[in-house]
């Protein structure tokens, strides 16, 4: 039901704002985002796509792994959260603890700010996600290489 409602909302949404250079999408129905009928040609941002390995609402394959493997090598990243599902990747409501995704999201945003104008997608774009320092002590996070997603 949520994905069906999302289709109507996203078809009216303009994702081509040239001011946006990097975005984070957690467990999105990527097939809708990558659909050329909704403005893929106008997407000017690098994408950090995060998916839980046990997400039954938006399964990582075909919603994340397949589309990521087919995407151009423009500096996008796919991070899989081992054991993550659609509901345990967010910060616990009312608790002072942070989400398991806070470090990786912060690293991505910091990388985008540090890259400045060169943060835009492209084959020679600088890496926005450092090789380490963004993991979680409670859940394994894996940066999946494009080549591995193509399998």
Place the predicted regions along the sequence by residue.
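Short beta-strand/loop motif that positions the catalytic acidic residue
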Residues: 43, 49-51
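Alpha/beta-hydrolase-fold catalytic nucleophile elbow
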Residues: 24-27, 50, 81-82
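Alpha/beta-hydrolase-fold serine-hydrolase catalytic core, especially in secreted/extracellular enzymes
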Residues: 83-84, 91-151
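Catalytic histidine neighborhood in serine/cysteine hydrolases
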Residues: 70-87
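Short alpha-helix in the alpha/beta-hydrolase fold that links the catalytic acid
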Residues: 36-38, 59-69
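Short, conserved loop/helix-junction motifs that constitute active-site signature segments
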Residues: 17-18, 38-44, 70-73
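Acidic catalytic loop of the alpha/beta-hydrolase fold
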Residues: 30-32, 54-58, 86
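A conserved short beta-strand
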Residues: 1-2, 12-28
């Amino acid at each position: 039901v949520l994905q069906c409602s999302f289709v109507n909302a996203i078809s009216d949404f303009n994702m081509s704002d040239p001011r946006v250079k990097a975005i984070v999408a957690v467990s999105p129905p990527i097939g809708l985002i990558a659909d050329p009928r909704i403005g893929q040609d106008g997407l000017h941002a690098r994408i950090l796509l995060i998916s839980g390995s046990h997400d039954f609402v938006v399964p990582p394959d075909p919603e994340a792994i397949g589309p990521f493997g087919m995407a151009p090598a423009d500096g996008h990243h796919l991070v899989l959260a081992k054991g993550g599902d659609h509901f345990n990747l967010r910060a616990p409501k009312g608790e002072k603890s942070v989400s398991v995704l806070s470090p990786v999201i912060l690293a991505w945003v910091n990388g985008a700010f540090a890259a400045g104008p060169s943060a835009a997608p492209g084959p020679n774009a600088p890496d926005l996600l450092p090789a380490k320092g963004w993991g979680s002590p409670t859940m394994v996070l894996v940066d999946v290489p494009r080549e591995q997603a193509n399998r």
